[in-house]
UniProtKB/Swiss-Prot annotation:
Keywords: ATP-binding, Cytoplasm, Magnesium, Metal-binding, Nucleotide-binding, One-carbon metabolism, Potassium, Transferase. Catalyzes the formation of S-adenosylmethionine (AdoMet) from methionine and ATP. The overall synthetic reaction is composed of two sequential steps, AdoMet formation and the subsequent tripolyphosphate hydrolysis which occurs prior to release of AdoMet from the enzyme. The gene is metK. NCBIfam families: metK (TIGR01034). It comes from Shewanella piezotolerans (strain WP3 / JCM 13877). This is S-adenosylmethionine synthase.
């Protein structure tokens, strides 16, 4: 008998908020490619026929904001005016200014290792052992569904798909925390006007849902909701405006872990909202990979202009194999969580961010914060 249900959602790269995230991170990458020490805070707003890019930047680099924006929108798939949003004809407004010298004064140091945090704040990292990437299953499979939607749209397996899509997966859990199965699946996808509802439902079920969701978790009682409104022709920035940083739960753990509130996209690594959240994931994943806990949530916090974290705390939900006080001591000894230290530890001062801006920042092994290279040393130091 399942004790409880838990749901997470994801959105595709063509969702308006994700278009904005990807443009912000594409601008960030272009700047970091020329100037790894740049300070970037890039925000994007998209609506019918227009994109506005704003924020604060301090850099020696020059990048073509208009060309970066058009290229990003084109790669996502908005390439026809009949979609209401066309990479080649949309208006692009550039409202980028310089970063405040007051912030620079707090961050920059004569000794780079003493670089202060770019702002105050609290960040969380999380890992558990219910998937092979040590992520919660609901968000992992929600991402997989919309990623699959993008793949079969772009390779024209389902040529009537359009870029905007959303997924949601509800898992049932047993009393011991193990997965009992999938209770419900929601997949809403934008489509051409000429496809029938019957063809759409069959195509989505056979080409997207069944290849992605493990059969062992599906049953006759699993509920499927495919385009439950019956029509999703108007989508993307025509249907809704999009803004950088509005999908922070999709970007992280799907609600299974707490969130400090800071968004990621468009921010260089001096912004601990982003870099410390990545480092916290790295710490939590290595603790779980080392077998020191089955679930681990770590919180770190910072004061603007101060290098050392103001706090580190760990919650293992009763699954720790050693005392949580020892875990905190291990974290302090094995991980440098100062802004400069974590940037060096994870090699963050380089153009790797646009790829993070759709389908989740965590649980994807191509990113350096997903490595488990500290697990063996942690386990040995813990005496296990």
């Amino acid at each position: 008998m399942a004790k409880h249900l838990f749901t997470s959602e994801s959105v595709s790269e063509g969702h308006p908020d994700k278009i904005a995230d990807q443009i912000s991170d594409a601008v960030l990458d272009a700047i970091l490619e020329q100037d790894p020490k740049a300070r970037v805070a890039c925000e994007t707003y998209v609506k019918t026929g227009m994109v506005m890019v704003g924020g604060e930047v301090t850099t020696s680099a020059w990048v073509d904001i208009e060309e970066i924006t058009r290229k990003t929108v084109r790669e996502i798939g908005y390439t026809h005016s009949d979609m209401g949003f066309d990479a080649d004809s949309c208006a692009i407004l550039n409202a980028i200014g310089k970063q405040s010298p007051d912030i620079n004064q707090g961050v920059d140091r004569a000794d780079p290792k003493e670089q202060g945090a770019g702002d105050q704040g609290l960040m969380f990292g999380y890992a558990n052992n219910e998937t092979d990437v040590l992520m919660p299953a609901p968000i992992t499979y929600s991402h997989k569904l919309v990623k699959r939607q993008s793949e079969v749209r772009k390779d024209k397996t389902l040529p009537w798909l359009r870029p905007d899509a959303k997924s949601q997966v509800t898992f049932a859990y047993n009393n011991d925390g193990s997965i009992a199965g999938i209770d419900a699946v929601v997949l809403s996808t934008q489509h051409r006007e000429d496809v029938s509802q019957a063809d759409l439902i069959e195509g989505v079920m056979e080409t997207i849902i069944k290849p992605v969701l493990p059969a062992k978790w599906l049953s006759k009682d699993t509920k499927y909701f495919i385009n439950p409104t019956g029509r999703f022709v108007i989508g993307g920035p025509v249907g809704d405006c999009g803004l950088t940083g509005r999908k922070i739960i999709v970007d992280t753990y799907g609600g299974m872990a707490r969130h400090g509130g800071g968004a990621f996209s468009g921010k260089d690594p001096s912004k601990v909202d982003r870099s410390a959240a990545y480092a916290a994931r790295y710490v939590a994943k290595n603790i779980v990979a080392a077998g020191l806990a089955d679930r681990c949530e770590i919180q770190v916090s910072y004061a603007i202009g101060v290098a050392e974290p103001t706090s580190i705390s760990i919650e293992t939900f009763g699954t720790a194999k050693v005392a949580e006080e020892l875990l905190i001591d291990l974290v302090r000894r094995h991980f440098d969580l100062r802004p400069y230290g974590l940037t060096e530890m994870l090699n963050l001062a380089r153009p790797i961010y646009q790829a993070t801006a759709a389908y989740g920042h965590f649980g994807r092994n191509e990113f350096p914060w997903e490595a488990t290279d500290k697990a063996e040393a942690l386990r040995a130091d813990a005496g296990l």
